[in-house]
A protein has these predicted regions:
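Active-site histidine-anchored catalytic micro-motif
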Residues: 1-88
């Protein structure tokens, strides 16, 4: 009853909101990469690994996992200047 979704970061919070409004009783983690994989130094694999770990330990709900942290879907935003997701 855990789901990890890889997703583009520009609309990740929008997708998280839509999923959360569906009232699905699962632990759903969205994650992605701020640096595309093709550039070689992507953060995508690190974020994916974190998302897998968070999926095993968090209660049902919708979360975003980026930069070694997890956030409730409605308490996070992407900071395009710094290249990280930040808690609201």
């Amino acid at each position: 009853s855990q789901i990890v979704i890889t997703h583009g970061t520009d609309t990740m919070t929008d997708t998280a909101r839509i999923i959360a409004n569906g009232n699905i009783e699962k632990t759903i983690i969205l994650t992605g990469a701020m640096i595309p994989y093709k550039f070689g130094s992507s953060d995508g694999l690190f974020n994916f690994g974190g998302a897998l770990a968070f999926a095993q330990s968090l209660p049902p709900g919708v979360y975003i996992a980026m930069n070694g942290r997890y956030f409730d879907w409605d308490k996070v935003k992407k900071n395009r200047k710094t290249g990280v997701f930040e808690e609201l």
